[in-house]
């Protein structure tokens, strides 16, 4: 050992202290130089080393010679080598080469996994701690039998320091072990050995340490394990491809069987070997196939089926079955309810009347299209498909949101309802289902309406619908008459594009699914898929998804794909699968703001005990939330999902003062008004300066109202109308001001702006327009009263004001100021000043009209007067008698100014007949007979026409049609 320790002088101290015992064992194993009896060399050319000794011996060729082992070796080591040489049979072990020096380089290249070993002992530890290798007798006792050939063959390689003492102070190199720590803190290592008496253990015991199963494994995984893993992956890949192929063949076969299957035949249940659920959605797999499997409302199902059956006469040629007469009691009751005053018919009664109504002249229903409306996920599309197949149609589905072009929309509708493809699979007529019709533009809806409004023949034969005999060229150009039913599906029936369609459609409101029926269906799905779920848990899932069938089934499939075979309430609360971003109604948002939630009605999706579900909008931090915090987040989410913030704020403003206020000092009202002002400031800043990042704060206004005014009482909420009324009144006031300003004289308008009139002048002007006048004739007025009346008339004409007579709903006549500037400057709640009497207003109105005519005649006289010597018009009074050319003519009358072009054609005076020389021709008149009255009539008409030119009364005939009350009036009565 001394020579051996001298040769290790170049090795680090920590390595020597850690592997001292192992290095000594390796040196003793390499020291056996006894030649093998067979004389076969240890290694063969070209063969890689397989054992630890071969790896050490292979390094001899490349290493330099080292001095032999020291003579002072222990006698125990020599005796061990002699026993090992005696135990080896002939030809079992090859002759090892002569040892030159310890192969430290080979030892360094080996992975002893030092990170798993204990810290090396201190250098001054006693060498007696090293456990010597076991003797051959110990090996024989260990295996329970004498030295056999196989045991002798493996004796040298299986020698281990733990053979004599299984408890080691250092981890073994070539064995699997476990470490144990005593109560005093001493670490010990135990070697793992298999049971030698068990079948198949000896082979594994011989090969595992040396074939990659022990600590000398370079890859970490044996080659056999790698091969087995690769084979398993290849086998799994082949199984998946075979499963896909079988699923494809199964789907094709099921489609053919469904097409060839007669109506109402039961479907075959899939076998257990077909794991179709792992490759398809459960929503499609468990979708209803028959009428009896539907979960929707029975009344809705029957109404849609009855409407489809109304097409049987046109599509199938089947006569409509006659209805059985109802008992005599029920019609009397219905008629009594219908004839009751103020009794409105229910929606069900209206639908029944529409279905019982007769057909149109073309033997089609009066409503050519059915419109299903309701929230998403309730099964509207499934209902349309099942009902159409149940009625004997082949369903053709199109999505209106995808085909938004009007031409494409028309082509798809005509191809499904009028072309040769009206016969679908199996010779069945088509039924067109248009999904998401609320997403179609107005132009596409107009195309659908034009197809629905095409008129057919008015005469129908007894054998069925009559075929147009002639004149069908224009109808064929339009596309022909609609002879197939169309079912439209929408989520929002109040979309602007559906206003015209709803008036002609058979409207069906899709109610929510009953929770009991939905829970039963979900339990059937979970049982068939091997998933355990309690009915209470499924009810919680239905409540979380608002009874959405699609969301519930998709949530179950998602949890099942994650390996959950048992569903609990905590899983339902923690998951967010199935939640949809759906816009809430305005009334539901206002109800959420003004009413406190019930204690037992706890939202499933907002459990405060879950750290990942404290808020629907984000993950949030862990911790519990109080009830006030939950209400805060719930109202905030409802306000953010409403989508119409202005309408929400208007509803809050119109309804918060109608609630039961608990604050007698109205402090909550003041705080609410401050929040409303803050919301207006945010909206103005966001839209005027385009600071749209401020729009994240307005949803907090409903939260503040909830904190201030929420109570347990059910609020009476009305739709907001104050904003619309204020806008209408504002536009009315602007029109009044514009009308007033446009009628003011230019001299007055130049000194009065609209704002100055509204704020300063109009209030005082109303006092000026209400003088104290006696309700008597103007001839009885004094000079002062006449001047006051003339000033009043002049002021009203300057501001274009007058009094108009109107009739009130009671039948009384009043005079109202026009334009009514009193509405601009006086509030309706304030007491009005003492108004003028009816006679006074009538007198003022008459004087205003007379003054208007006087001014109009004066202006017309000035305009029509001729110019004298180039002097401006209006100076004829000054220059009337001056000059030879000055001619003074009387001003034309009022009717002459308006009908001047007519007066030119009329004869003013009867001119005497003259001859060629200008002499008046005198004709002799014959005496008329007694019965001849025609000349007298002619003379009367001639005199009448002559008098028309001199008369002050004119009339004008207006062509057209009038429904007014008329009476015969002769011209002679006017003259």
Swiss-Prot record:
One of its GO terms (molecular function) is ATP binding. Its main location: nucleus. The modification Phosphothreonine is found at residue 51. ATP binds at residues 374-381. One of its GO terms (cellular component) is cytosol. The keyword DNA-binding applies. Residues 58-77 have a biased composition (Low complexity). GO terms for biological process: DNA replication; positive regulation of DNA-directed DNA polymerase activity. It comes from the Eukaryota. Residues 30-83, 114-141, 246-276, 320-346, 858-896 are annotated as: Disordered. The keyword ATP-binding applies. Residues 122-136 have a biased composition (Pro residues). SUPFAM superfamilies: P-loop containing nucleoside triphosphate hydrolases (SSF52540). It is found in: Nucleus. The modification Phosphoserine is found at residues 64, 225, 871. Chromosome cohesion factor involved in sister chromatid cohesion and fidelity of chromosome transmission. Component of one of the cell nuclear antigen loader complexes, CTF18-replication factor C (CTF18-RFC), which consists of CTF18, CTF8, DCC1, RFC2, RFC3, RFC4 and RFC5. The CTF18-RFC complex binds to single-stranded and primed DNAs and has weak ATPase activity that is stimulated by the presence of primed DNA, replication protein A (RPA) and by proliferating cell nuclear antigen (PCNA). The CTF18-RFC complex catalyzes the ATP-dependent loading of PCNA onto primed and gapped DNA. Component of the CTF18-RFC complex, which consists of CTF18, CTF8, DCC1, RFC2, RFC3, RFC4 and RFC5. During assembly of the CTF18-RFC complex, CTF18 may first assemble into a subcomplex with RFC2, RFC3, RFC4 and RFC5. CTF18 then interacts directly with CTF8, which in turn interacts with DCC1. The CTF18-RFC complex associates with PCNA and with DNA polymerase POLH. The CTF18-RFC complex does not interact with the Rad9/Rad1/Hus1 complex. CTF18 interacts with SMC1A and RAD21. Interacts with DDX11. Belongs to the activator 1 small subunits family. CTF18 subfamily. This is Chromosome transmission fidelity protein 18 homolog. It comes from Homo sapiens.
């Amino acid at each position: 050992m001394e020579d051996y320790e001298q040769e290790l002088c170049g090795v680090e101290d920590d390595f020597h202290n850690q592997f001292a015992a192992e290095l000594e064992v390796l040196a003793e194993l390499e020291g056996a130089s006894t030649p093998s009896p067979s004389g076969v060399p240890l290694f063969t050319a070209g063969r890689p080393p397989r054992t630890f000794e071969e790896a050490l011996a292979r390094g001899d060729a490349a290493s330099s010679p080292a001095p032999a082992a020291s003579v002072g070796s222990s006698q125990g080591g020599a005796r061990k080598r002699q026993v090992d040489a005696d135990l080896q049979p002939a030809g079992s072990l090859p002759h090892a080469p002569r040892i030159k020096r310890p192969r430290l380089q080979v030892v360094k290249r080996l992975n002893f996994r030092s990170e798993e070993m204990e810290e090396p002992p201190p250098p001054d530890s006693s060498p007696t701690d090293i456990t010597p290798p076991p003797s051959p007798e110990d090996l024989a006792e260990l295996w329970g039998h004498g030295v056999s050939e196989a045991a002798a063959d493996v004796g040298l390689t299986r020698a281990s320091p733990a053979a004599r003492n299984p408890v080691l102070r250092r981890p073994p190199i070539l064995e699997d072990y476990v470490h144990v720590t005593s109560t005093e803190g001493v670490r010990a290592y135990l070697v793992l050995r298999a049971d030698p008496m068990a079948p198949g253990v000896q082979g594994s015991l011989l090969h595992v340490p040396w074939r990659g199963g022990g600590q000398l494994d370079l890859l970490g995984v044996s080659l056999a394990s790698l091969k087995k893993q690769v084979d398993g992956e290849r086998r799994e890949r082949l199984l998946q491809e075979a499963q896909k192929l079988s699923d494809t063949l199964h789907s094709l076969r099921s489609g053919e069987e469904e097409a060839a299957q007669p109506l109402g035949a039961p479907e075959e249940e899939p076998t257990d070997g077909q794991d179709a659920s792992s490759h398809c959605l459960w929503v499609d797999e468990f979708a209803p196939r028959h009428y009896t499997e539907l979960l929707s409302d029975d009344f809705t199902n029957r109404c849609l089926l009855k409407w489809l059956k109304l097409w049987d006469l046109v599509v199938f040629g089947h006569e409509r079955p006659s209805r059985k007469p109802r008992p005599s009691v029920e019609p009397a009751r219905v008629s009594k309810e219908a004839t009751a005053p103020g009794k409105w018919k229910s929606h069900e009664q209206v639908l029944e009347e529409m279905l019982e109504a007769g057909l149109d002249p073309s033997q089609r229903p009066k409503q050519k299209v059915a419109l299903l409306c309701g929230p998403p996920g309730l099964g509207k599309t499934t209902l349309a498909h099942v009902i159409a197949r149940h009625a004997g149609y082949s369903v053709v589905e199109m999505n209106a949101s995808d085909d938004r072009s009007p031409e494409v929309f028309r082509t798809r509708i005509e191809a499904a309802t009028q072309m040769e493809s009206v016969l679908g699979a199996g010779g069945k007529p088509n039924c067109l289902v248009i999904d998401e019709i609320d997403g179609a533009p107005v132009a596409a809806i107009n195309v659908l309406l034009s197809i629905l409004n095409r008129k057919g023949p008015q005469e129908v034969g007894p054998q069925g619908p009559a075929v147009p005999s002639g004149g069908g060229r224009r109808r064929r150009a339009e596309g022909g008459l609609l002879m197939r039913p169309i079912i439209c599906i929408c989520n929002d029936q109040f979309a602007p594009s559906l206003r015209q369609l709803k008036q002609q459609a058979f409207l069906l409101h899709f109610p929510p699914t009953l929770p009991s029926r939905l829970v039963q269906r979900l339990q059937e799905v979970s049982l068939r898929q091997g998933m355990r779920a309690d009915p209470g848990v499924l009810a919680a899932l239905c409540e979380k998804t608002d009874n959405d069938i699609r969301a519930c089934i998709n949530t179950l499939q998602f949890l099942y794909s994650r390996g959950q075979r048992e569903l609990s309430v905590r899983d339902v609360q923690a998951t967010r699968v199935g939640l949809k971003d759906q816009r809430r109604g305005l009334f539901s948002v206002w109800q959420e703001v003004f009413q406190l939630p019930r204690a037992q009605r706890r939202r499933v999706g907002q459990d405060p005990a879950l750290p990942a579900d404290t808020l629907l909008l984000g993950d949030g931090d862990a911790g519990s939330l109080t009830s006030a915090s939950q209400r805060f987040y719930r109202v905030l989410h409802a306000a953010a999902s409403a989508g119409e913030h202005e309408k929400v704020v208007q509803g809050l403003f119109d309804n918060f003062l109608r609630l039961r206020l608990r604050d007698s000092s109205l402090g909550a009202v003041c705080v609410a008004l401050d929040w409303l002002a803050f919301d207006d400031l945010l909206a103005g800043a966001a839209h005027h300066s385009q600071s749209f990042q401020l729009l994240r704060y307005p949803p907090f206004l409903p939260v503040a109202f909830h904190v201030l005014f929420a109570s347990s009482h059910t609020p009476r909420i009305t739709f907001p109308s104050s904003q619309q009324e204020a806008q209408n009144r504002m536009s009315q006031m602007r029109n009044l001001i514009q009308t007033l300003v446009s009628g003011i004289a230019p001299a007055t308008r130049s000194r009065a702006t609209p704002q100055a009139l509204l704020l300063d002048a109009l209030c005082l002007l109303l006092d000026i327009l209400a003088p104290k006048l006696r309700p008597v004739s103007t001839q009885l007025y004094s000079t002062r009263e006449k001047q006051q009346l003339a000033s009043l008339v002049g002021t009203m004409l300057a501001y274009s004001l007058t009094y108009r007579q109107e009739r009130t709903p009671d039948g009384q006549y009043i005079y109202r100021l026009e334009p009514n500037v009193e509405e601009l400057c006086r509030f309706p709640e304030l007491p009005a000043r003492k108004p003028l009497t009816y006679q006074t207003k009538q007198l003022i109105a008459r004087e205003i009209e007379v003054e208007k005519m006087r001014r109009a005649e004066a202006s017309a006289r000035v305009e029509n007067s001729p110019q004298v010597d180039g002097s401006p018009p209006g100076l004829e009074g000054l220059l009337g008698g001056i000059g030879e050319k000055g001619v003074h003519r009387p001003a034309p009358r009022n009717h002459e100014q308006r009908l001047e072009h007519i007066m030119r054609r009329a004869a003013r005076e009867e001119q005497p007949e003259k001859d060629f020389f200008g002499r008046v021709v005198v004709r002799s008149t014959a005496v008329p007979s007694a019965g001849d009255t025609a000349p007298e009539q002619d003379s009367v008409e001639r005199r009448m026409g002559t008098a028309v030119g001199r008369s002050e009364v004119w009339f004008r005939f207006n062509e057209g049609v009038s429904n007014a009350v008329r009476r015969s009036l002769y011209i002679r009565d006017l003259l």
